[in-house]
Amino acid sequence: MSTVNPSVAKRSAARLAAVQVLYQMEMTGADTERALQDAKDRRAAEPKGRMADPDNSLLNQVVRGVSAQLEDIDGHVGRALSGDWTVERLEAVLRAIVRAGAWELSARPQTPARVCISEWVDVAHAFYSGPEPGLVNGVLDHLAQTLRGGEMGKGA
């Protein structure tokens, strides 16, 4: 039986929490710092051991990064969507996932692209049991090839 590295679990928890914060921001109009503080307060009120504590640095980076670069991120995501799909047409949680994944691919080269894609697909599986994780995979793979072509084995 294998065990999960605690730092990996913390980063995974941070990605999941980031989606929740981004969703809250979109649904309530809360600003970035308020939404991050609300998330911290909710975690403090939860029983310990229920979930891995998130890597707060990564959580803050993702939420602040997506917030600060939303227009650019939406442009990248929009170009990666197929057909007549638009970022606005995506359901809010799905939109938060692809935005966060797109930000990480563009802003955190220390995370290998394939790891980044896999992590965000795992986050999608936490919310969806249908085709949505496949959409996340397709969009992020397209973005990885565009943003990190050499790493993905294809030219940009």
UniProtKB/Swiss-Prot annotation:
GO cellular component labels: cytosol
Residue stretches spanning the membrane: none
Molecular function (Gene Ontology), one example: RNA binding
Q: Which GO terms describe its biological process?
A: DNA-templated transcription termination; transcription antitermination
Could you list the residue ranges forming a coiled coil in this record? Answer: none
What keywords tag this UniProt record?
Answer: RNA-binding, Transcription, Transcription antitermination, Transcription regulation
Protein family (similarity comment) = Belongs to the NusB family.
* Function as written in the Swiss-Prot or TrEMBL entry: Involved in transcription antitermination. Required for transcription of ribosomal RNA (rRNA) genes. Binds specifically to the boxA antiterminator sequence of the ribosomal RNA (rrn) operons.
Q: What is this protein called?
A: Transcription antitermination protein NusB
Gene name of this polypeptide: nusB
